[in-house]
């Protein structure tokens, strides 16, 4: 079974308070999501392997460490996942960015795939799937399915808030995928929204309804 990691860092929790607040405007909401994504990326990449190289400082030669050639891929689930990309690229500028477009059918709450664009070397990359909200889990599970069908073998899921129901769905469908969240919320309501949640992340990021 994939592990669930809930980040309790004070900076993350502070920023999530204002992400949740309905009075937070589009500009500030966008900036906060970007910042939280950066902070989460710092933790989610903690297990990247290192290798030793030799460099020359202004003073002497030195042996030091760099990331051991791992190829990372970021996969935002359109459209809300786009809000998390830049925050991670600030720390990992060499990461490739693919896109998976999914929307949730308002009647069935099931995900419908409408767009997929991935790096050409899928099998060689470690992927991080990005979605601010893990609600029913359907979209995240489908995005992971889409990656696996195209050859991806190492996948992590990163969300800002999650409902227990969504976590359960992803863990049952993809027991090899670890889930990283900034907050584990109470439940889903009858409309499939996370409670207390943060509303519709896509609408709040892009100022739409």
Swiss-Prot record:
GO terms for molecular function: GTP binding; magnesium ion binding; uracil phosphoribosyltransferase activity. Binds 1 Mg(2+) ion per subunit. The magnesium is bound as Mg-PRPP. Allosterically activated by GTP. The keyword Magnesium applies. Keywords: Allosteric enzyme, Glycosyltransferase, GTP-binding, Magnesium, Nucleotide-binding, Transferase. It catalyses: UMP + diphosphate = 5-phospho-alpha-D-ribose 1-diphosphate + uracil. Signal peptide: none annotated. 5-phospho-alpha-D-ribose 1-diphosphate binds at residues 79, 104, 131-139, 200. This is Uracil phosphoribosyltransferase. It comes from Bacillus cytotoxicus (strain DSM 22905 / CIP 110041 / 391-98 / NVH 391-98). The gene is upp.
